[in-house]
Design a protein with these regions (language model features):
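Structural motif in protein kinase domains
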Residues: 84-94
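ATP-binding glycine-rich loop module of kinase domains
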Residues: 2-63
């Protein structure tokens, strides 16, 4: 399956999540393979789209927030594009033999990443949720932007 826009050609690799109000797809942009995998969060309901749209438009100007790659409307839905990192969840990383110093280093890296990205408060809340902090063996930290279903 493919999703094409004027400047992008997303090859869908898999569906990560599906719900009544949103779907999450993992994809790769065939026009820009150097960017790696991305995550498409698809908002399905008009009320959610209207709530997120002004917020997302403001993020276009937040240059340090480079995990946010953009958004586009299609077939009455809003597609939000984020970088995708295929790393292990923090819980799994900490279940390995990690000492106190290494855990402190990981905690510091989480804070550094939050500050570096200039994440808006809403995204901070989401990325600090269970399963959304991803850690590499070298203690590099990335975030997954799978939202909770909005109320």
């Amino acid at each position: 399956m493919r999703i094409q826009t004027l400047n992008r050609d997303y090859e869908i690799l898999r569906m990560a999540e599906s719900g009544e109000r949103m779907d999450v797809l993992i994809a790769r942009d065939e026009k820009h393979p150097e960017e790696g995998k991305c995550m498409l969060v698809i908002l399905k309901q008009e009320t959610d789209i209207h709530r997120f749209l002004p917020f997302l438009a403001a993020q276009q100007e937040n240059d340090p927030f480079d995990d946010f790659m953009g958004y586009f409307p299609r077939d009455g839905r809003l597609y939000i594009v984020f970088r995708f990192s295929d790393l292990m969840p923090l819980r799994e990383r900490l279940s390995q033999d990690t000492g106190f110093e290494e855990r402190i280093m990981i905690a510091g890296n989480i804070l550094k990443r939050l500050v570096f990205l200039h994440l808006p408060a809403y995204f901070q809340y989401e990325v600090l949720g269970e399963g959304n902090i991803l850690a590499a063996e070298n203690d590099d930290i990335r975030f997954s932007y799978v939202f909770h279903e909005p109320d």
